[in-house]
Amino acid sequence: CRTEGMSCEENQQCCWRSCCRGECEAPCRFGP
């Protein structure tokens, strides 16, 4: 899942909760 340009809430729904720390870190850009 790509989270580039996504908001923090969208990132949480798409990736892992731990990715929500201001910005999406590189390892978090691609999730399950």
UniProtKB/Swiss-Prot annotation:
Tissue specificity field: Expressed by the venom duct.
Where in or outside the cell? Secreted
Q: Which GO terms describe its cellular component?
A: extracellular region
Which residues bear the site annotation Pharmacophore? R17, R29
Any Pfam family hit: Conotoxin_I2
All disulfide bonds of the chain are: C1-C15, C8-C20, C14-C24, C19-C28
Q: Which residues carry this modification: Proline amide?
A: P32
Keywords linked to the UniProt accession: Amidation, Disulfide bond, Gamma-carboxyglutamic acid, Ion channel impairing toxin, Neurotoxin, Potassium channel impairing toxin, Secreted, Toxin, Voltage-gated potassium channel impairing toxin
On the tree of life, the source organism's domain of life is Eukaryota
Any idea which GO molecular function terms this record carries?
A: potassium channel regulator activity; toxin activity
> In the record, which positions carry 4-carboxyglutamate?
E9, E10
The role this protein plays is:
Kappa-conotoxins bind and inhibit voltage-gated potassium channels. This toxin inhibits Kv1.2/KCNA2 and Kv1.6/KCNA6. Produces stiffening of body, limbs and tail when injected intracranially into mice.
Instruction: Present the record's domain note.
Output: The cysteine framework is XI (C-C-CC-CC-C-C).
Tell me its family: Belongs to the conotoxin I2 superfamily.
Add the further remark from the entry. Answer: Negative results: has no effect on Kv1.3/KCNA3 channels.
Q: What name does UniProt use for this protein?
A: Kappa-conotoxin SrXIA
